[in-house]
UniProtKB/Swiss-Prot annotation:
PANTHER family associated with the record: ANTI-SIGMA-F FACTOR RSBW-RELATED (PTHR35526), SERINE-PROTEIN KINASE RSBW (PTHR35526:SF9)
Protein name in the entry: Serine-protein kinase RsbW
Reactions catalysed, as given in the entry: L-seryl-[protein] + ATP = O-phospho-L-seryl-[protein] + ADP + H(+); L-threonyl-[protein] + ATP = O-phospho-L-threonyl-[protein] + ADP + H(+)
EC numbers: 2.7.11.1
A GO term for molecular function: sigma factor antagonist activity
Class of enzymatic activity (EC top level): transferase
TM region(s), chain numbering: none
Length: 159
């Protein structure tokens, strides 16, 4: 396993007004690491979805605003983003299977609300893992060298 080149950590209130700050920070981190414009934009959307989910769902039963922890681990070939909260947890696999995939032939007028964030995050990032102990932690990886992005489900090795 490669060692981390840089590690950046943020701790912010679980409030929607901080999403733009997180997006701005992500842009700077990814630009500094040499990521492409498309990778930056995809990652901004995925991280915004994950943070918005934490803001909307993690602390909904608590009158106080909780905290969100966010960290970026920069490697030579990838950036790992970890977002965690200490709020309400959920069963990721059950939620995914309950919502099910969206089909191209579904009428957009009857498209169900909610759950798009999970599918969006998984489609925009190269690897996504959700842990649900003491809140929810979402780990996302974006490979920043195109040669290492998955090809038909298989990782392309560079010699």
């Amino acid at each position: 396993m490669q060692s981390t080149q840089d590690y950046i950590e943020m701790r912010l209130p679980a409030s929607a007004e901080y999403v733009s700050l997180i997006r701005l920070t992500l842009s700077g981190v990814f630009s500094r690491a040499g990521a492409s414009y498309d990778d930056i934009e995809d990652s901004k959307i995925a991280v915004s979805e994950a943070v918005t989910n934490a803001v909307k769902h993690a602390y909904k039963k608590n009158s106080e605003i909780g905290m969100i922890n966010l960290c970026f681990e920069i490697f030579d070939d990838r950036i790992k983003i970890v977002i965690s909260d200490q709020g309400e947890s959920f069963d990721y696999e059950a939620t995914k299977s309950h919502l099910g995939p969206y089909n191209d032939n579904e009428n957009i007028d009857f498209l169900r609300e909610g759950g798009l964030g999970l599918f969006l995050i998984e489609s925009l990032m190269d690897e996504v893992t959700v842990y649900k102990e003491s809140g929810v932690t979402i780990s996302m990886i974006k490979y920043i060298k195109k040669e290492q992005v998955r090809n038909n489900g298989e990782r392309v090795e560079i010699s």
